[in-house]
């Protein structure tokens, strides 16, 4: 408890050299030494340890060393060269920067044919004037407030034997762990170590790519000192098409026929996603039923990275029936089409039946109306039940 900072440094240096994994030492012992030094060399963490014990440091913020690389602490004493100038077998680990994700809207035509899009983006890059040091001299001071960790720990007493620990970036150094003298700040980046630049990226959307597919530009995200630069990622978002619908490598297309076309034959021109004109026609004597599907091989979407292979094009046929027919039209149709057995009823069978009257109905609206009616009735019944109870209570008073 009474050891001075210099005593701690000497003791750590001696034990760390002895137990370093590159010298055949025990990795776990080396890690424990780093954790102990990290706590004892930080006045704030040491106070927490003295008052509440090791568990208080581990709980919630990993202050017992879990957030600090033992090799980083070792290299703060000996530099990055390791032993004998040969370099450490492990080296200093760099934090990886965050990826930047952008949605990219594309049409179905662009996914079918492939396309390229040039996009202008702003990003942070290491300041070229100070090489990311933030100062003219290249020097910086360790933040006294957070002891260079970039983080502060606050403790709040919740009750007897209960504490809450919170870790937050240091306000003095903005989480960097370093302080730069105002007079020594880099004139270009103002001590921020990075500057903004405009970058134009050309995004290649290949044939057959899917909705939600990611296109990655490695190492093109924001740069930061001692950080492995993250990626810029574009996520494809397919816009809705007025005529075609895509399912995997297949395309679906709806076409409405008149009743005459459905019974007597049809032909029409379908404009595909690449502008080609496809002639679609029925076979002689073929009758198309409502909601019937037909398939055309190799006219679906190109398969990703196999552009000469395609899925299927499915055409769903809808049949538009006339609203009514004249008696003469009915006679003509009956003379051509076979009558169904159910329509050939005798007069005696008809006399024994009750006549009914049918009317047009929008079934979706009808079901919504009934659902609303049932909900209203249930609400009214519940309201009456509560009301009755209140009236009885008033009578007792």
Swiss-Prot record:
Would you say which domain of life the source belongs to?
Answer: Eukaryota
Q: Does the keyword Zinc apply?
A: yes
Membrane topology label:
Lipid-anchor
Q: Which UniProt keywords apply?
A: Chaperone, Lipoprotein, Membrane, Metal-binding, Methylation, Prenylation, Repeat, Zinc, Zinc-finger
Residue span of region Disordered: 367-397
Which residues are recorded as modified (Cysteine methyl ester)?
394
- GO annotation terms (biological process): protein folding
Zn finger (CR-type) location: 114-198
| Localization per record | Membrane
Q: What is this protein called?
A: DnaJ protein homolog 1
């Amino acid at each position: 408890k009474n050891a001075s900072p210099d005593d701690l440094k000497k003791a750590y240096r001696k034990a760390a050299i002895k137990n370093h994994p590159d010298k055949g030492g025990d990795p776990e012992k080396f890690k424990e030494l780093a954790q102990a030094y990290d706590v004892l060399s930080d006045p704030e963490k040491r106070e927490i340890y003295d008052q509440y014990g090791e568990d208080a440091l581990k709980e919630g913020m990993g202050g017992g060393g879990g957030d600090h690389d033992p090799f980083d602490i070792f290299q703060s004493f000996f530099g990055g060269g390791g032993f004998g100038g040969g370099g450490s077998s492990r080296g200093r680990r760099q934090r990886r920067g965050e990826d930047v994700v952008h949605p990219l809207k594309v049409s179905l035509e662009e996914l079918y044919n492939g396309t390229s899009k040039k996009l202008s983006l702003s990003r942070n890059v290491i300041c070229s004037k100070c090489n990311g040091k933030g100062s003219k001299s290249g020097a910086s001071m360790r933040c006294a407030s957070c002891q260079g960790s970039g983080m502060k720990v606050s403790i709040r007493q919740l009750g007897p034997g209960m504490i809450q620990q919170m870790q937050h970036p240091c306000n003095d150094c903005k989480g960097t762990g370093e302080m730069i003298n105002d007079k020594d700040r880099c004139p270009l980046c103002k001590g921020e170590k990075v500057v903004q630049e405009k970058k134009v990226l050309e995004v290649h959307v290949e044939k057959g790519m899917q909705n939600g597919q990611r296109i990655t530009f490695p190492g093109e995200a924001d740069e930061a000192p001692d950080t492995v630069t993250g990626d810029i990622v574009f996520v494809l978002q397919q816009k809705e098409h007025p005529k075609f619908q895509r399912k995997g490598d297949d395309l679906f297309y709806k076409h409405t026929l008149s009743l005459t076309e459905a019974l007597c034959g049809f032909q029409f021109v379908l404009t595909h996603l690449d502008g080609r004109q496809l002639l679609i026609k029925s076979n002689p004597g073929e009758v198309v039923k409502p909601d019937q599907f037909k398939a055309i091989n190799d006219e679906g979407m190109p398969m990703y990275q196999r552009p000469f292979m395609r899925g299927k094009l499915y055409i769903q046929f809808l049949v538009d029936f006339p609203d009514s027919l004249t008696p003469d039209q009915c006679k003509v149709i009956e003379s051509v089409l076979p009558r169904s057995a159910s329509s050939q009823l005798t007069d005696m069978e008809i006399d024994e039946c009750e006549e009914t009257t049918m009317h047009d109905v929008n079934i979706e609206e009808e079901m919504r109306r009934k659902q609303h009616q049932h909900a209203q009735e249930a609400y009214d019944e519940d309201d009456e039940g509560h009301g009755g109870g209140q009236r009885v209570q008033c009578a007792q008073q």
